[in-house]
Amino acid sequence: MPTKKTSRKGIPKNQARKTRNTRTDPLIKGKRFPKKKNGWIRICVWGNAFERGYAHGVLLSKELLEIREKILPFLVKTFYQIPYEQYEKDCHDQLYDTIRTEYPEFFEELSGIAAGASSSTGKTISIDFILAWNADLSMSNMYKSKKHPSKDERCSAFIAVGDATETGEIIMAHNTHSDFVSANTFNIVLEIIPNKGDGKKIKMQTAPGFIASGSDWFLCENGIIGCETTIGGTNYKPDFSGGQTPYFCRIRQAMQYGESLDDFVRIMQKGNAGDYACSWLLGDTRKKEIMLFELGLKTSNIERKTNGVFYGMNKAISPEIREKETEPKSANGFWDMNETSGARNIRLHFLLYEKYYGKINLSNAQTILSDHYDVSTNEETRGNGLTICRHANLEDRITASPRGAFYPWGCTDGKVVSSSMAKRWSFLGRWGPTCGHVFSAKDFLEKHLQFKNWSSVLPNMGGNPWARL
């Protein structure tokens, strides 16, 4: 704990002078911790919207420059198969005026990120790039086709409370499933402290330049904690007409200004563009209540519990959402053990409702997220495309790896938290596959020459221990 005189929430008044850019930005309202913690980069920003954004941009300027010059253009070319310039223009045309009008605070923060990164690097990093990067998940379904599916099937997660857990408190757990290139940017733990009167502070896993989490793992000062799993196979494209707004602005609004689970629902439903359909798993640590909130385009599902479990595996729990808003293949595969979401559904149901019900704690939450049991073969594996800790890069079955055999996609992190940890403003995180598996880009590319065009961006991953963050 700090011993020197502090301002709000324990941040030293002279903290700004301890950033890595003190010579150019002596009054920056932010701090980057000097060393990574088991692979995680930790930063804190505070002040008004532009000040927070500016500090964010300065502190993560090196990472943002790499995303602008290499990573985002690669992702757009690989997954959307359009020129990057077209993608950035599409984002501007669809979202720029809407965000500026509907969310002026967040527009200021985005502008600050661009200004801070430009100042720190000496290169132009535009707000259009920052917007296009934030909008990656929102725009994914715009370009979905049989040749390049959207970035769904992204996570495994659960939340439990009451008689389902060892102590009765809330336990929440989540791992991200993603392509290894974009996933490698999500090692940021960002704390945001707004000025008094501008909402509550937030702590979240995120990527450089993002104003919301993106991986969607967050703690809120008001006692709300949350995560989500994407609803895969949606049968519609987002609608940003008529003032409909992107999900990353709505969820940030909910995190910063929502006071209750009801507020989260209201804020997320208002202006919903259907751009990133999710099964949200939310908990109120003050009331010991959890909620499943599934939001598609026109259909939603809300369930609450003070005893029990909710989990997500990239299919809607709601039969109505599956029937109305997902493609037949996705809707019909809810319990299909040969398909990734169906297989994880079967395994999560067994682990959460049979093996660990009444005993769920932080330790076995980590075990569940690391699980490599393949229900289609009834055997333990080293991990594959069907397991909770997913490894599509080790998979040659097309039903288990729909993007193709040995695709560099899978589990890239793990996070767990309890109510008591959240109240102490911390969680446990593992950077890299939840199981601890080490991924060597060099070894992978030597074995799988079809991915040689990934060589300039594919990272090494894994091998880090869990960290308290």
Please report, for each region that a protein language model flagged, where it lies by residue:
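C-terminus-biased signal that marks the final domain/tail of proteins
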Residues: N21-A157, D163-T167, V181, N195-D198, ...
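Active-site rim segments in enzyme catalytic domains, especially the processed small/beta chain
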Residues: E166-E259, R266, R322
